[in-house]
């Protein structure tokens, strides 16, 4: 049941907690890897969000543009990004997965962004044990076309939505991605007691 699987409490005014945060993970990610909780499958125009109060996965909206998510999209547990939400991440999987699925991922880069909520970096990741991605360890290992498609998506995906904005501010490699992850982990304070 989704509501029991991935409850995320908190909001921009507080911080995330629940079973997607503050849990001792029985299956820790391998060295150089993180967990990403997927909210939106690759190829979707539907923007799903995990409700911060109930833990249910809701359809937030359908993108107003004719674009689709270029990769599985979600968040890194136990982090707090510049926009007050968990740090966003994309995982370049061959086949899309369902909202609520935890994926082990290897960060290879970061896309710097800004939207109506503030700083909104996106960590770019690949699956660590998939042969197609075994030689991808840094941003420069991705094809320029794939990187351009991801960047273009985030430049235009909110273009037709009233009151929404997004702009990209460049890309950086693996070390910058880990810097963002460490910063977001440092920002995360855990549940209020």
Model regions and ranges:
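Hydrophobic N-terminal alpha-helices or hydrophobic patches in metabolic proteins across all domains
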Residues: 16-193
